[in-house]
Amino acid sequence: MLILVLAINFLGTVYGYYWYLPQLLETPARFLIFVPDSPTATFFFLFVLLAFLMKRNAPLLEALALVTLVKYGLWAVAMNFLVLAVTGDLPWEGYMLIASHFAMAVQGVLYSPYFRFSFWHLAIAAVWTLHNDVIDYLFDMMPQYSMLSDYMTEIGYGTFWLSIFSIALAYFLVVSKKQTKLELM
């Protein structure tokens, strides 16, 4: 089962970086690591899955994966529904992105009982995630949705709160001592 999840996430990660390629070609080098949001989230998760296959945990990558899988999974769902609301149309790729990104968020939550990160790992993931918001919305490096350009201020504000929600959810699911921890193998 882990091999299948790994393979699906690998393909999604490759497709995600391909989707960002036009924007990456125009991005200043200092921002490159922060531009491809969703594929970077699944990239973190790929390393978590590889660690699981070796019967290990990778706490910092687990924290980064959970926070960013939830955040960017839900963000992409919201953006595609916003495109539909603004334009009245959504191509089939938009529906594919809704399904695949919702699955990203769900898999982060489903695997969270196996994660072993601490408050400090989560704090680092929180700084990464909030810093990414700053890069996206203060330096205009956010994913390019030209039909939504009139709403960037509101999208940026909502994205900040989505980051806070994702960080809080990760705290509740993993760091909180009340949660049951599971072993994968």
Curated annotation (Swiss-Prot):
TM annotation in the entry: 32-52, 66-86, 155-175
GO cellular component: plasma membrane
Localisation: Cell membrane
Keywords: Cell membrane, Membrane, Transmembrane, Transmembrane helix
Pfam families linked: DUF1405 (PF07187)
Mode of membrane association: Multi-pass membrane protein
Location (main, coarse): membrane
InterPro entries assigned: DUF1405 (IPR009845)
Name of the protein described by the UniProt record: Uncharacterized protein YpjA
Natural source organism: Bacillus subtilis (strain 168)
Lineage: Bacteria, Bacillati, Bacillota, Bacilli, Bacillales
